[in-house]
């Protein structure tokens, strides 16, 4: 009997690989299917509102009854009262990583926190939200630069003062905001089904 499918709407191949690993890969009781839909991203500071708006678009595009989830991740600087937050990818796209780091040059506190918000619609159309959070420090870029801001975020729980980009994937997934949020989704799915 084939495993039930759950749809992850993302166009980010790195994110897809990471989430597949966190949810159990081939050993999971469901099949993770990717739909790279082009969703309009609501602009704002409320992460749950942003994720739920993306989810509603995904449900509309895929049709009712298909279990589907979306995620949105924010990186917030302590000194900037939550900014750039959900706008981080636009900051990086327009300024580059080095200038994003430079924004904190005049501040002693380089503290930051990352939040991943997952919005999930089950097969009955019920909506669920899961969030994970990790605190850390903004540092000069270290490690690969092919996955967003991973090379400038050093989580407080890093054993060797490594950025996400320098960490082994398995280690990163244990402490990252995305790993924490998807661990909640995984527990929910494994306990209640899709």
UniProtKB/Swiss-Prot annotation:
Keywords annotated in UniProt: Cytoplasm, Hydrolase, Magnesium, Manganese, Metal-binding, Nucleotide metabolism, Nucleotide-binding, Nucleus
Keyword Metal-binding: yes
Similarity comment text for this entry: Belongs to the HAM1 NTPase family.
Disulfide partners: none
Binding sites annotated in the UniProt record for Mg(2+): 41
Binding site for ITP: 10-15, 54, 72-73, 89, 147-150, 172, 177-178
Protein name: Inosine triphosphate pyrophosphatase
Species of provenance: Kluyveromyces lactis (strain ATCC 8585 / CBS 2359 / DSM 70799 / NBRC 1267 / NRRL Y-1140 / WM37) (Yeast)
Compartments, record wording: Cytoplasm; Nucleus
A Gene Ontology biological process term: nucleotide metabolic process
Primary localization: cytoplasm
Molecular-function annotations in GO: dITP diphosphatase activity; ITP diphosphatase activity; metal ion binding; nucleotide binding; XTP diphosphatase activity
Cited Pfam families: Ham1p_like
Gene name for this UniProt entry: HAM1
Catalysis: reaction(s): ITP + H2O = IMP + diphosphate + H(+); dITP + H2O = dIMP + diphosphate + H(+); XTP + H2O = XMP + diphosphate + H(+)
Cofactor note as given: Binds 1 divalent metal cation per subunit; can use either Mg(2+) or Mn(2+).
Cofactors: Mg(2+); Mn(2+)
